[in-house]
Amino acid sequence: MSGVCTLVSQKKKPFIGDKKFFEHYGFKVVDTINDYELMALSFETSETPKFSDSARKMEIDSQDFTIYYSNECPYVEYEVKELSDYAKDKGIKLDFIKIDSLDKAKNAPCVFNNWANFYKGKFVSNTILNANAFEKLLK
């Protein structure tokens, strides 16, 4: 496909684009996973983009709290260090998986590759966590 894609949600969620804004500029929903929609603005007739099979799972095998992240946001490395230190101090098992290649992004277990929280194998949120927010999610 020659064009542009974006991720939106059927319900307003943090860090997700506004669907009505993109519809106004001609974007169309081309795929859906749960509440998340892939919108595309095609510049030519070609193959329609879609979410990868791995993203459709929205779950992982690990039962530990696991965060998939990339450096798309300038605060990510700071939060990774803060959470890592916090988990170590509290004796909490916390895994980080950095998405640092195109292959890893294409094979991520959910629609987010900038920050995705999984707990007990299930996708929890895409909110970048600090120590306080992390502690609340564990309760």
Where does each model-flagged region fall?
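Conserved GNAT acetyl-CoA-binding A-motif
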Residues: 1-15
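Structural alpha-beta junctions
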Residues: 1-4, 25-31, 87-94
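Conserved catalytic-core motifs of GNAT/GCN5-like acyltransferases
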Residues: 8, 19, 23-40, 124
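C-terminal "cap" of GNAT-fold acetyltransferases
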Residues: 34-57
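Local sequence-structure signature of Cys/Sec-based thiol-disulfide redox active-site neighborhoods
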Residues: 54-89
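Thiol-based oxidoreductase modules, predominantly thioredoxin-like and allied folds used
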Residues: 91-104
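Structural micro-motif
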Residues: 109-118
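Non-catalytic, surface beta->alpha helical segment in thiol-disulfide oxidoreductase systems
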Residues: 119-139
